[in-house]
Structure formats: structure tokens, C-alpha cells
């Protein structure tokens, strides 16, 4: 590894004797240094508190030619003799040796060895790519190290990623310690695979699974289609803006849950623990975060295990006001359920795309019949893991754990929360149409009038008070849910927050999203009159100021009713005939009127309410098997009423199934997809990604949606 720098007071930079580069204190963020040298005056300036707050545990030396008392946080006093320079260098070397986490440290050392390989992968450290101009460009674009770090498991020095040996095992043990799990498993093909690993390890045909209707499709795939378990669905909330909410409070009542069992498996209704597994979204895509203690206290005694799908969170234990929501911080006993937590590290933590991790917390039930041992879980793990893993992905998970260790993780997320609060305040100050999704008033005082430090430390400033008009969610109990402060959620005009009804004019969020992308800003997702921006410790005040400025600029376009060709040139140029002479407000009005005509907000809400659930007539696994056998036909969604779905259907994002294999098409689900079909034809350029239904252009030039149903 290249030697790191030494940071020093500006007056000392030229006086230090070191082979390392010496940089001034003001020219570093301390991520590139291995030691710090300060003066006595510096020690009184606040630099020691700053260094402590980083959580980097850097060795700090105080340079003084006179005898001084050693301040707290200083390693030693030096005055410039040769022996002391050696001590400084020794401390810097020691810091470097302890800096890297287990697997990544081993990987970097192995790459530096420069071994000659006759094993796969065939590009042989990139040499194959460099034999062609396109390959050379590819190699130069990504850089040498990514090719050198892509290696075969034929060399055992890095350990085994499938049976968890060597430095790979050490890395996962280290992550388990950081995240407060009993065991942690690194998954290299996303939380879609992580969820399937857990559900395949726990569920079999005939098992009951308590199933959040908000669950990501991967949970349907693993629990219902692959394992064949029988679901008991929990209804969930949607609000008029299109935000995904949480499960209704009444669903956590024991008698209610036992009654649900009587409808699908009456022989299990009175068992002490009728559910093998409950699958709950710890945080929804749109930032509704659950109270894990509350979930376990109300339904835990009915379940062998609870899987908290934490794809959209995972950082909650590093943010004090969110810590209560973390299942991994709970004290559990032998009567509690075992806990699994899956996290999409790549979403808002520090990981390459596809990096995920499974946390297992069940030592408190070890020895009981319901306990899932490591070997059983690892059997499912190997069903879904490649035998040719990409080591940089694994290394990223290792480094992510190191970043989150101790004070550094807490500091990084504290800064993220504060930056997000400042961004919300800026939007409230500069924008009239787009509103942050937070309580407008708390204790009779405007949200934005509280100091940022107060807002960042008290969850009540993000809580969903039951019945409050601003959020529009129904069925919540006190202290059940709160808004994730690291999800910057905005609402757009079109919904009267007081009544939940449509207003005369609206600005569908997809139009705003298109405008932002036209101008180099990429939101995470949008739906109806809501838009989401993910916040991570990567953010800066400058980056968010650019977003706020662009929101204000779009509002000016709305006010000026600018020509569409100026606001959305890509859409206009792709469909010049359709949008000729259109203005921005004209497009907004037309799309808003489409939403109103189909009452899309209520259709979306109804799809996740129990009274509107599609009828279940087959086990999802059986319906899927019929699909694989070809015992299906492709029909227009318009004509699908009363037919049994062979595929799950959904818009993506968010990846939540609206109809599940084995359920009957009709009702709100069918009308919702017909509304989408109308939009595809009426408003080209704004079509959503649909999965499980297929848009086909018929002979008359009209696009229609089709889906597979059982014969």
C-alpha cells in the first residue's frame, strides 16, 4: 500500500523529518494521513476534539521544544530528535497496519504479489482485454487494480467465500460485530438473493408465513414460489401522494392474526407459534420506518422467526433517534423469535451495486427445535451464490463494515441527517409548490424554525402522528412509524392534503423527475405526486444546493408556463408531433386529469387493502408451475377479469407485486393496470417499467397490456 501522509501544523510542515509527504492540517480531511503533528497552540484550538470526532483514532503528536503537559488525546510530545522521528514513523506504520479490514487487507497484499496465473478468469489480470482496441479502452477506463483483484478461488490465500473460511470468514465476523449480529453473511447478488437465502432456509410447503403486502417481489419469489409456503397477508397503507406506508396497527392483534389463519389453514389457528416466519419491511422504499421492538412484542410470540427486510435502511443503529427501530440492538430472550435482517448495502451504505448482507441474530433460541443452524442456512446460501464470486464486491462489504465501526459511522450518519434537514429548510424557504414530507408544525411551532441540532436528535419531528392531515396515512397507532430522515421525500401539487382529494391542477412527479434528469440530477424514484431522493454520507451542501436551485427553477417554468421544448427537450424531440406547441402546464394538466379520471390514487391505495386484495385460489408455487409447464395463455389485461394470474405483476420501481401468481385478476388491480395502459398511449415518453405484464403494439398502432393467465 502506498504510504499515507502526515498532517502537521502549517508552521511545522517544513520542519518534519519523514520520507512521507507532509500536508498542512487545513489541507486534509484526515482520510489520507497516518499521523498528526500539532503545536501547543493547536492543542487549544479545538483540533483534538475534531480529530476525536472523526473516529479515525489517528496517532497525534505534540511538537514542542519545551516541556509541556501531555493533553488528552495526544500520543506523545516530540521535540525533533532522531529517535522521536522514528517513533512518529512507527506510529504511522502501526496505524496503516491496523487500518484495513480483514478481507480487503489480504486482497491488497495478494494483488501486490503479482502472481502469474493459469487459472480463471480468462482475462488474466486484464491482459486479454489489452489485446484489442475495445478491450484496451475497457481496461484503461476501469484501471489496472480492478482486473488484478478479479481472481479465481483456485488460490486459497483469500479464504473461501462459500463455506466461509480464512479472511472471508474474518470479514464476516467483523461485520457481525459492527452491526451487532450473531452471524453475518455477505451476499454478492443483491438483497433479492439475500431474501431468497433466508426464506429458502426457513420455509417449506405448508408452512405459514406472515407476509407484509408491501414486501419486495424477492420475498414472494423465495417464500411463496420457491418454498411454496402459505401466505397470510397484512394490509398496508398508501397515501394520496403515492407514498408507500406501513402495516395497519390492527394487523398486529393476536386474535386478528389467528382469525386470518382460520381462513387459510384452520388446523394451525390455535398452535402456540403458528407462523414459521414473518416477513416485514423494516423501512419501506418511501421511508416509513417501523419500531422493531413493537413488532416483536406484538407478533413475535406467534412466529419462529421474523425477517426484517431492511433493503432500504440498514444504517438505523448508527443514528441515535432511529436506534430504537433496529432489530439488531434489541435484547432478546428464549421466548422471542429468531431474527434475520437483510440489508442492501449498495443502496445507502458504502457498497458496489449488488452488495448485500444477511444478519442472523438467534443465539437466544439456540437448542430449540425452531432454531436454524448455520449449516442449514449456508445450504440455502450456496443455492444462490456463484462459485465464481467477484472479489471486489466482497471487499466492498468488508470496507463498509470498517467505515461504520465505532464513532466514524455515527459521525458520518449524523452529518448526513443534518445536511438533509438543512436541505428541507432550504426547500421550504425557496419553493412554493414542492413540500418536504415532514410535519409542518410541531408543538405549535413551524418545523423549520427549530434548530437543526434539535431536529436531528428527536424523532418526534419525523413521526407520523395518527390521523394527522399532512401525511394522509390511515390505520396508524401512536409511535408506530416515523419518516426516515435519510429519505428526502417531496410532494408535488395535485392533492389537497387536508382532504386527500384531487385539486384542479397538479404537477405529476414524473414530469419533475424528467426535468431533473434533463439537467443532470437523478432522483431515486417518483410516483403520482411524490418524489424520493436518497441521502447518504456522500452528500454535500453544494450538491443539495444544486438540487434546491433546480427545484426552484422548475417552479419558475410552471409559473411562466414555459414551452415544453425548452423544459423537456429530450421528450419533445422524441415525440415532436404528439407534443407540438405544448406548454409545461398543459402537459401537467393532461397527466393530472388522467390520474383524476381513473382515480389512480385510490386504486393504488385499494390494491394494498384487505377488502380489495385479489382472491387467492391457488398456492403461488402451483400457479408458477403451471406457467413453467405452459398451461397458460396470454390475454389482454382488459379481458383478464376472473382469470388466474400465472405471473406476478408490478410497476418497477418499487418492485412490490400488485397481483401474485394464483390470485384472480379483477377489481382495483385490473383497473390500475388499465390506467397505466391509457397513460402509455396518451402520454408517450412517460411510460413506467412494468414487469409481469407486457406492452404490445397491436395492428391498429395502439399499445395494449397483456398478461399470462392459467388456461
Swiss-Prot record:
Its cofactor is pyridoxal 5'-phosphate. CDD domains: Orn_deC_like. Its EC number is 4.1.1.17. It catalyses: L-ornithine + H(+) = putrescine + CO2. GO terms for cellular component: cytosol. Belongs to the Orn/Lys/Arg decarboxylase class-I family. This is Constitutive ornithine decarboxylase. Pfam families: OKR_DC_1 (PF01276), OKR_DC_1_C (PF03711), OKR_DC_1_N (PF03709). The modification N6-(pyridoxal phosphate)lysine is found at residue 347. It comes from Escherichia coli (strain K12). It is an enzyme of class 4 (lyase). The keyword Hydrolase does not apply. Pathway: Amine and polyamine biosynthesis; putrescine biosynthesis via L-ornithine pathway; putrescine from L-ornithine: step 1/1. One of its GO terms (biological process) is spermidine biosynthetic process. InterPro entries: CheY-like_superfamily (IPR011006), OKR_de-COase_N (IPR005308), Orn/lys/arg_de-COase (IPR011193), Orn/Lys/Arg_deCO2ase_major_dom (IPR000310), Ornithine_deCO2ase_N (IPR027464), Prn/Lys/Arg_de-COase_C (IPR008286), Prn/Lys/Arg_de-COase_C_sf (IPR036633), PyrdxlP-dep_Trfase (IPR015424).
